Amino acid sequence: MLQSTKVTKSVLTNVLRVEQRRGFLLSGAAVALGSTYIFGRDAKLADAMDRGELHNKNEDYAKLRAERTEQRIKALSNNRPMEPRYEGHVPLYLHEKMLLFAISGIRAFFHPENGINIVQLGEATAFPIFLENLKQTMLADETGRRILRDQPNVRTDILDMDKLSKLPKNTFGYTFYKWLEKEKVSPDTRAPVTYIDDPIHAFVFKRYRQCHDFYHALNDLPIIIEGEIIVKALESANMGIPMATLGWMLAPLRLKKAQRDRLYGTYLPWAIKTGLTCKPLINVYWEELLEKDVEELRQELGIKMPPDLRAMRAKRKAMIKRLNEKYQKN
């Protein structure tokens, strides 16, 4: 009887263990199946989202997205002091203009190589009274009035670089083409006007900005810090550009003594004298003068070429090299 009881207990124990294992396996299988379903579904959802098939099946979704974007733009424009008055115009409040002037001024002083700093400072200092005076200068001149009426853009496709490259070497157009090639720049890199409110003032400032490279090419001044300061002094004396005045007065303070000596001794006096005595450059229709003899153009404008800045820099560099070699030999 006792032995039968032991056998019964042993059988029950084995049955219980089997049931526990079976329950464990069933639970594991259930978890695995659930995970496969859940994570497999997530993977399918992710794939569908990646293919753009999960949502946006409504044909009007693109329209809804465009409407939302337009609403955001309208909400932003409602926070501006006025409606934009031309393409790309961003109206600013007075305190925003003052902040733009302060920040761009500091950045331009310490990082003049960053073009965006110069662009922002230029517009921050383009006061309406200055722009109106420049506009009146154009209205008082027949060519200036045509420029205001035509509102031309200085771009490579309009200037036709291929045509300029085939002009006679004595023409202004060929001189301009070779200068662009030598300096590895393009007229297309000039930034559009953004923060000037009056549309005509905005064009006047854009015209000044787009013609900047013509002044470089006409006087064969390179795009280096010294060359930029010289052109800024010319623009300041000729057109009264506020940012140009700040540029030629403050930028030399950060240069080496040899550079300052060249500027103060030779180039700034030339730039200021030339700017004060030559024809107002804002009234020059450069696009119509590309086939003109470059020397005749300089004479008509009242511009005499400055000393070759590249040659002066190369001469000093060669002198320093000779002195270093002499010192090393001794």
Curated annotation (Swiss-Prot):
GO BP terms: ubiquinone biosynthetic process
UniProt transit peptide range: 1-31
Pathway: Cofactor biosynthesis; ubiquinone biosynthesis
UniProt keyword terms in alphabetical order: Lyase, Membrane, Metal-binding, Mitochondrion, Mitochondrion inner membrane, Transit peptide, Ubiquinone biosynthesis, Zinc
Membrane topology reported for the UniProt record: Peripheral membrane protein
GO cellular component terms listed in the entry, alphabetical order: extrinsic component of mitochondrial inner membrane
Lineage top rank: taxon: Eukaryota
Quaternary structure and partners: Component of a multi-subunit COQ enzyme complex, composed of at least COQ3, COQ4, COQ5, COQ6, COQ7 and COQ9.
PANTHER family associated with the record: UBIQUINONE BIOSYNTHESIS PROTEIN, UBIQUINONE BIOSYNTHESIS PROTEIN COQ4 HOMOLOG, MITOCHONDRIAL
HAMAP family: Coq4 (MF_03111)
UniProt name for this protein: Ubiquinone biosynthesis protein COQ4, mitochondrial
Record gene name: COQ4
